[in-house]
């Protein structure tokens, strides 16, 4: 069985030796990283903001500061911490940056078009890790498996059109193939044991973006899609969390941004209007969920994402700032607000341009039992 993780193992067993002390492991987090996509159309490169919990300070452009001023690249999109390394997926530069999480210095730059091929490796999008490997999607229609010791390609899997998010469970990876919002998105299931890939058209899935798995149940964040060519395209469908059962998906709840911790989805819906925040508990009712309002003590101007620290349960909401025209400013720095697990406002931190993802500096601490 292959256990696939987003950042770090979350469950451990206590250890006891008849001749020695008893101890257990605890997941801890000492900071967060904000992936800032920049603005490709204005030639603003992306960056990484580091938040240190101990000092409560957000440091901008931490990658550039520790790598001789070198840019992170064009349109970074996702990242994670796995072991003693950090991995950042940089879409527009066709790279995955491998970074020492303590020194923030580059260990390796994986050039995805060289690793997979010019077409196959184009535009890496999202990443997960486990079992000594990272797995990332590319708009070339592939998932790559890369060894985290020698950074060599272990396997590549042909999936659907324009894959986005992915999630692992047991010996499988489920991939959301967006079809670039054209309405014909589908799901791929990779069997890591056999190397076989099943790409499945699913009734009710149009533009899938993320995959969540809880107790073996699969949920898809599916967005609206567009018919026709821009600027005359017409918006169709709805953005929602959907429960996957065979070749059919049924709506669980409205959602545009979502993150999951311990079987609970933390959700933002209608981000371009009057944003709504909620929590959908999938544990007691896996098919429909139990959705309740997430009462944040204060909101943000223009939500751009949500995530939850797996060690503390604290909630992070990304946002654009308000521009002079009264609308979201996509060309200047954004911000992130940090809340307690109950939704009480704690802190606000500035970010770079276009904050788009959060990941956490999670590790494991050994605790002696009394």
Q: Across the structure, where does each feature detected by a protein language model lie?
A:
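Predominantly soluble domains enriched in secretory-pathway, periplasmic, or organellar proteins
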Residues: 16-370
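C-terminal motif of bacterial Sec signal peptides marking the signal peptidase cleavage site
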Residues: 10-14
């Amino acid at each position: 069985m292959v256990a696939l993780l987003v950042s770090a193992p979350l469950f451990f067993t206590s250890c006891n030796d008849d001749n020695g002390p008893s101890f257990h492991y605890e997941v801890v987090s000492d900071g967060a990283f904000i992936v800032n996509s920049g603005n490709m159309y204005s030639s603003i490169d992306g960056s990484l903001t580091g938040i240190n919990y101990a000092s409560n300070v957000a440091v901008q452009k931490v990658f550039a500061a520790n790598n001789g001023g070198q840019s992170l690249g064009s349109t970074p999109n996702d990242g994670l911490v796995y072991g003693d390394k950090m991995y950042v997926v940089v879409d527009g530069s066709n790279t995955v940056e491998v970074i020492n999480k303590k020194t923030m210095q580059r260990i390796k730059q994986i050039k995805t078009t060289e690793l997979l091929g010019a077409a196959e490796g184009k535009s890496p999008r999202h990443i997960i890790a486990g079992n000594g490997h990272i797995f990332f999607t590319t708009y070339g229609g592939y998932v790559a498996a890369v060894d985290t010791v020698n950074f060599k390609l272990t396997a590549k899997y042909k999936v659907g059109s324009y894959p986005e998010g992915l999630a692992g469970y047991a010996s499988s990876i489920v991939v959301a193939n967006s079809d670039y919002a054209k309405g014909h998105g589908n799901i791929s299931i990779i069997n890591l044991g056999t190397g076989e890939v099943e790409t499945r058209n699913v009734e009710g899935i149009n533009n899938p973006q993320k995959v969540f798995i809880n107790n073996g149940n699969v949920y898809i964040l599916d967005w609206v899609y567009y018919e026709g060519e821009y600027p005359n395209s017409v918006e169709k469908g709805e953005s929602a969390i959907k429960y996957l059962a065979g070749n059919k998906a049924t709506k669980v709840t409205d959602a545009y941004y979502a993150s999951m911790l311990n079987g609970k989805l933390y959700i933002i819906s209608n981000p371009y209007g009057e944003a709504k925040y909620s929590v959908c508990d999938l544990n007691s009712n896996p098919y429909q969920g139990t959705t309740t309002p997430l009462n944040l003590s204060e909101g943000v101007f223009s939500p751009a994402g949500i995530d939850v620290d797996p060690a503390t349960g604290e909630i992070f909401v990304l946002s654009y700032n308000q521009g002079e025209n009264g609308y979201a400013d996509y060309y200047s720095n954004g911000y992130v607000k940090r809340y307690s697990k109950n939704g009480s406002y704690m802190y606000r931190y500035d970010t770079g341009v276009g904050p788009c993802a959060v990941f956490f500096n999670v590790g494991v601490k050994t605790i002696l039992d009394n």
